[in-house]
Amino acid sequence: MGRWMRWLLIGAVSLWCLPGIARAESEVDVLLNMLVENGTLTPVQAGQVRRQISETKEARNKQLAKEIVPDSARNWKWKGDVRLRDEFRDRQGTGNDTHRQRIRFQFGAEGKVAEDLKATFRIATGSTTDPVSTNQNLDTFFGKKALVLDLANLEYTPEVPGISKVSLIGGIMENPLWTTDPMVWDGDLSWDGAAVKVSQEMGPTTLFANSGVFSLDTDETEPAALWVTQLGASVKPFADSESEVLKNFKLTGALAYHDYMNVTTSAKAGTDPITREADNTAGATDFNQFNPTVELASQLGQIPFSFFGDWVHNTSAPSTGNDGYALGIKVGKATVPWSLTKGWEAGYMFERLERDAAFDEFVDSDFGGGGTNRRGNVVWLNLAVLKNSTLGAKLFFRQDLIDNFGSGASLAEKFREDRLQMDWVTKF
């Protein structure tokens, strides 16, 4: 290639990459094809020029993005989801069977506002009177749906010598405790208060501690509050193994203590068993709960699986009606559409939660309408059908442990609810 032609091409490439004077790729291709046809360039040289143009344009676009978008905006990560749900509930003993459609919308962001400081917020559908649901029913003659502040917090993560990670969180936050299931804490519950999270890596073992204090009700003479503390560890003892199952084997366990203070004046205890606040006895004077949790996880054929167990014991309740436990298994993770190894998730859980084992306003609201005094099974299946989009079905089979209607019914005759939820979830 002649020197004059090299300079001509360099000039053309530079001109083509300038903002406001860009040329269509087809025009560049025509020019390069002409130079190949008249022998000025070989096909290999033309390909090199095309790659150079592409790389130069990409680098220039990245530089322009940095110049146009301020640093503060680039530090923010936006995310959200929409969930459409069709739900059927078959209730035996009440006659109140229902078939309804529901929607959930969540949108928020988290961003780095200083070297060790992160801010997070999220708005969601829901209600200011229901702490364990972000659903809205589609049954109000096209009425508008309410949006509420679901999360808003600051997280400070200072560098502490000798400790892998320390986080101080204040505001409205997600559950600061490590959990495997929603028996004690519903997944939609947002926590108002302050928390400290500490973790320390020690070879294949990671030790962690979580603690916090949360305000429940400040309008009473003696304000209601919740203190929580959790100590735990996770270990991967066979990280160097050639076996896929052993290499990915991970054992995690934790013991938590939950101390509710002055909740008897605020709790909606002993109310209608069909409502969300269903089943704590009116005589329950306190909730001091020990909550050990364990999970064994691994992977086989690129398919993750785990076994988990959860137990809760309220030391402040009478000697009966103060225990609960859940056992379950999860297989797969629905992330890649229609993939045999990464396109599905299935699971099963058995749960038994006695009347005063847990504070009934915060337990899983989907399992029989929420509340305690229940036992039953949960089965689910999720399929990744599109990028960032899943279809799922979940079945709940729940019945009372103690007859709430005072009829002395046998276990087979007590209140039962079978629930089917079919969800379409899209994340963005």
What kind of feature is each model-predicted range?
Residues 85-104, 109-163, 177-186, 309, ...:
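Surface-exposed loop and membrane-interface regions of Gram-negative outer-membrane beta-barrel proteins
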Residues 7, 11, 15-94, 428:
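N-terminal periplasmic/intermembrane-space "pro-region" immediately following the signal or transit peptide
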Residues 66-78, 113-116, 159-166, 201-210, ...:
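Short loop/turn motifs that connect adjacent beta-strands in outer-membrane beta-barrel proteins
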Residues 77-83, 100-104, 146-151, 191-193, ...:
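Transmembrane beta-barrel architecture of outer-membrane proteins
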Residues 89-97, 137-144, 167, 245-250, ...:
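Outer-membrane beta-barrel pore domains
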Residues 84-90, 115, 123-129, 172-176, ...:
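Transmembrane beta-strands of outer-membrane beta-barrel pores
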Residues 1-5:
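N-terminal secretory signal peptides that target proteins for export/translocation
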Residues 128-244, 256, 261-284, 357-370:
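Surface-exposed coil loops of outer-membrane beta-barrel proteins
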